[in-house]
Amino acid sequence: MLDTLISRSKIQKAFLFDVISKIYIATDSYPVNMQHYEICSELIDVLIDVTQIYGVDEEGGGSKFDKKSSSIIRLNHANPQENIVLYLREVDKCLALVCLINESEITKQHLINYNIDRFKEGLKKIFEHSHEITSAHQQQQAVKQQEEAKLL
């Protein structure tokens, strides 16, 4: 799914991060440049820090880091021929998609957002299906244990 996303959106690299551990749980099939991974991980740290300082809701409760959270940051240290932009979108409360995009492609942000929304929908369906399979398996195990208990 990430390969389709990056090819359709002209994204250079995409990471799906666990926001809490800042470890990527998925990436596209292209090789991982550790410098890119580190800068993407640091972006999550920065956003969490800023959210904790400025993002508390009016009731003083939860964080404002939600499904509408996103960030676009231009990297100044990048190669002059390679104007890279970091783009973060929250997938759910525990996952964030962080992409490296050529600055010339960010003008098509509406297309990128549309494709990311489709990616999020696909990921949600996978998680729901996985949950259904896990629940069915757990029910089968419970029935099996009950039957075994009756035999004893």
Regions found by a protein language model. Give the residues of each.
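Non-catalytic interaction/Regulatory regions outside core domains
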Residues: 1-152
